[in-house]
A protein has these predicted regions:
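Membrane-interface helix-capping segments at transmembrane helix termini in multi-pass transporters
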Residues: 4-19, 130-141
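Short membrane-interface helical motifs at transmembrane helix boundaries
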Residues: 1-10, 65-68, 127
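Conserved short cytoplasmic inter-helical helices of the MFS fold
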Residues: 2, 11, 43-47
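Membrane-spanning helices that line or support transport/gating and their immediate boundary helices
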Residues: 2, 6, 34, 163-166
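Short runs within selected transmembrane alpha-helices of multi-pass transporters and secretion channels
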Residues: 17-67, 72-98, 117, 121, ...
């Protein structure tokens, strides 16, 4: 609310839910990008483009239909999220056929990891949000708390030991640049 108030002054009726839904849509799309890259690397671009592109084309007519039937405007973003998840499933099916990537393995190693990391890293910012009443101070503290909480949880829970070693190596290289 604070960011929207600072940015817009007066918050339009559906702005808050739109922003939340758009952030969720961005997350679902971000999870898909590595899958898109893997599919393109297999060379099966035509089939992927027909399936995912065709499925994406449903966005406009479905949104129009749902708005025509009297649903609230945010239904368009919900439809986009459903289509994005559908495209994610299409990508996983293609990758299973081409590279043998298991749907269940992807759910466990990627999606479950993202969900658990997201939930745990949200605990401290939510506590801060409910404990601090001054809007500007709350905004700054919640942003900093989110940053610290997310970095900590991603590093210790979201990363494998190999990924943590990679981060340590890169951090060490970065620090050593300034020691010279």
């Amino acid at each position: 609310d604070t960011i929207l108030t600072l940015w817009l002054g007066h918050i339009p009726e559906h702005a808050q839910i739109f922003v939340r839904l758009m952030l969720f849509l961005a997350l679902t799309d971000a999870i898909s990008y590595p899958l898109i890259t893997a599919i393109l690397a297999t060379g099966d671009i035509k089939r992927y483009s027909l399936l995912a592109g065709g499925f994406n084309l449903l966005n406009f007519p479905l949104s129009y239909l749902f708005l025509y039937l009297g649903n609230p405007p945010e239904c368009t973003v919900i439809i986009a999220i459903i289509i994005s998840v559908g495209c994610l499933v299409i990508r996983l099916i293609i990758l299973n056929e081409k590279l043998g990537i298991s749907f269940n393995q992807y759910l466990k190693k990627v999606l479950l990891n993202v969900i658990i990391t997201g939930i745990i890293s949200s605990i401290i910012p939510l506590i801060l949000y409910h404990e601090i009443m001054q809007p500007i101070v709350r905004l700054i503290v919640v942003i900093l708390g989110s940053l610290v909480s997310s970095l900590f949880v991603i590093y210790w829970i979201g990363c494998t030991s190999n990924e943590r070693n990679f981060v340590k190596m890169k951090a060490s290289q970065f620090i050593n640049r300034f020691r010279k």
